[in-house]
């Protein structure tokens, strides 16, 4: 009732719908401060190229900036000349101004750095444009009609734009051209092949085709193409079954005249399903590596990629013995094909899990019969204290190799931190390259021969670029030294800098509260929580922050949104409960079958931990989370009534029995409720007992106990947790008389990541918490 009365009062005063009259000034001041956070640029990709002089090189860094007025993210390229001297110090000489990439969907420098490919995808039926730039001019502009293919895939999953070594051809993944639709006119159905133009004819819809779900609702079939950058000729790669969706294409060594790519089956591989299941954030979709001939090679010159005689399709499956293979990379000498596998996620059904790394010895003659897969980095089940917890890899550089041709540099998760690792694919040695004693997160941006360009940040400390060099020590393991690089990026305003400077940052080890003999050893280990606090934290209000997934992690890297909430005077307790990435496979697999209980208990245990240590005021605690974090948020206000003064949920999972029939990942409901057995009992038609279990473990089963004022932020285009889930729960709270506020973003999907939506979301969270924490 309080929200309704406030809205009526606001309407009478001519204020926006839903505006609380008492919070108008707070709304204005917080929005002004949040805009200052939005102005801080983000660091994207980077590329480094060798120069003719031995101790110099060239760098390109992509920088992003939010344009709230246009509701989009703008991108820029910044160039730098790198000079190294004998004392291992390095100097970056940046260009005075960045170059804006307006209308550019992707930027792909050639391996030598002498050419630059710009992709301009069209938002309508106009041709896709590929621009090939040389040192001083536009060398070619290629227009590709929709009849050839649709937009190129530039996302982090299917994307695979790849130059060949000679820099004459580019392979890429694009939307398959649209299939013919039935056409009708005054005489009824218009038969195919008719060349008559009839202004009275119209096209029907034809058969419906499944998509890959969340964020891919307008995409159907990713297909493989190669373009000659000189002639502009585009050829589709033949021989790939239409049931395979392709991505992550790379060129094999030149002698092979072939391409290697990842493919996902539309029936979910060996886990046969009648549909495509959502693939965004889902590493548990079976996939494999394939090889196919370069379509520009003459038939007589093509090597035989067939596994056996009589096989007509040129596509060869390279990883038949594994259920998952992605992120393929060839070693510089072409001897090894190295890749990542999420076979643990496939086997268990969880949407993400501990990765493994493997390699294939690539045959010099290009004959691919009888290839075997060797392990490089195995799955870590239960890490020893302080030791490597396993590989958690969300991407790999296009060129991740040091000059020895055997060592890869990549980013991974280690507990609550992102770290940089070196992996020797021959010796199988894994080492941590980023500072051992740092709780900050580190990510690799690019390699400069045997040196590393990286970015480091903490939850509320803006990213800073570093340059790392390996230092040899006699009789001791080599160490990496890191030099902070001055950049022309604008610093946060004096006001923000002053606020953020006054903080404490730590990663807490939280002992579990309910250890039992049934738990695997890894599940008995402490989990972690990131605690960002003011010096007088015990008198300040605190926000508990919960990640989604549940098999993701909230790393210690910079978050604009959390830095903004901290600036409002809150401590932040970010809980990486058991089931999160970065703590070994046994801890992760302890959660499926126990959601709504184990994860809820871990959050309450972490909260109790900081309360008992006198770090926070127990009477001033709020909670916020999205997706599975929203599941936990709504569970907590029901299972622990009176604990939280206020709550905010972004696209929360509130009722699994409703979600299972509407989400793009219905099998998630079965796996997280039943554990590993859920993978086998998944059905598009849940039984009565299934629906009862789903309801029993859902937050809505505890809703009668809720009294916490709750804010809901929902995306109307969400296919992962459809808007009906949050609306049902929120409407029930309103029916019960609990103070509730709902904001629906009509054009947003699950991430609520359109700039204006993200801004309005966290502005309202800040104001909502201020209103209820100030009472």
Curated annotation (Swiss-Prot):
Key word Signal present: no
Localization: Cytoplasm
Catalytic activity: Cleavage of an N-acetyl or N-formyl amino acid from the N-terminus of a polypeptide
Main location: cytoplasm
Sequence similarity: Belongs to the peptidase S9C family.
Its job: Catalyzes the hydrolysis of the N-terminal peptide bond of an N-acetylated peptide to generate an N-acetylated amino acid and a peptide with a free N-terminus.
The protein, known as: Acylamino-acid-releasing enzyme 1
